[in-house]
Amino acid sequence: MTIQQAIQHAITQLRTISPTARLDAELLLAHILGWSRAKVVAERDHVLTPEQEMAFNALIERRANREPVAYLIGHREFFGLDLFVDRRVLIPRPETELLVELTLKEAQRFNHTPLIIADIGTGSGAIAIALAMHLPHALIYGVDISPDALAVAAINVTRYRLDDRIRLLEGDLCTPLPAPVDILVSNPPYTILTEIDEGVYRHEPHLALDGGSDGLDCYRRLIAAAPTYLKPNGAILLEIGSTQAASVVHLLRQALPMAETGIERDLAGHDRIVWARNRYVIH
């Protein structure tokens, strides 16, 4: 069987469960062959060995059962990084890159070093690592309540040789932080489990997804802690579900009445990030 035949066969199996059936198939075959996806696309007439064909078919069967591609191949690209992921962590999403972009922009306000940032619910470490790679003078805390998630984050932190600038802390939301920080950033659980995609529900960790009956449980607790864990001129940036902006802004204004607040939209035009910048300064 040639690569072209294998891909076409896989597409027929995946098209009913994945809108990116061709991409999925090409990524999975690239993983089997140890090639780049570009080489798979270019070498359409290459003949697979029986062993390669069998391994590919096994992965396609798992993908047809809605297992995410990132778990099948063991990594995910995020903000130009190649991150190790498995079922212990939520798979980093493209829309979360906006959270990184806005945090990098916010960091430009601060001219002291080290800039101290806390990534609450760090998971795979994606946000913390992306920030550290672009902010060489920052100290970043990656906090997670899940020791399993922190084990994955540690692999990625070490891969990018950031052990000296990213400190991983186990605990609930802000409680492990040793002192107030300049920037709090978080992509907290904000989904209602009964409303999420079947494949996500079956395979990704519920601890990283479940936002409670209205999706706002973590926001309430995290934002309530912000006055304690933010420095007087600090900022908080939060990823949100597309219908949650007004509720989260309300929580921020209650907790930080002196703060400026704002909402940013993603490329699809959906509300995606809510932020607050604390204007209260101690003289």
UniProtKB/Swiss-Prot annotation:
The gene is prmC. GO terms for molecular function: nucleic acid binding; protein-(glutamine-N5) methyltransferase activity; protein-glutamine N-methyltransferase activity. Gene3D superfamilies: DNA helicase RuvA subunit, C-terminal domain, Vaccinia Virus protein VP39. Methylates the class 1 translation termination release factors RF1/PrfA and RF2/PrfB on the glutamine residue of the universally conserved GGQ motif. It is an enzyme of class 2 (transferase). It catalyses: L-glutaminyl-[peptide chain release factor] + S-adenosyl-L-methionine = N(5)-methyl-L-glutaminyl-[peptide chain release factor] + S-adenosyl-L-homocysteine + H(+). It comes from Chloroflexus aurantiacus (strain ATCC 29366 / DSM 635 / J-10-fl). S-adenosyl-L-methionine binds at residues 121-125, 144, 187. Keywords: Methyltransferase, S-adenosyl-L-methionine, Transferase. InterPro entries: DNA_methylase_N6_adenine_CS, HemK-like, N5-glutamine_MTase, PrmC_N, RF_methyltr_PrmC, SAM-dependent_MTases_sf, Small_mtfrase_dom. Transmembrane segments: none annotated. NCBIfam families: hemK_fam, RF_mod_PrmC. Belongs to the protein N5-glutamine methyltransferase family. PrmC subfamily. Its EC number is 2.1.1.297. This is Release factor glutamine methyltransferase. Substrate binds at residues 187-190. The keyword Transferase applies.
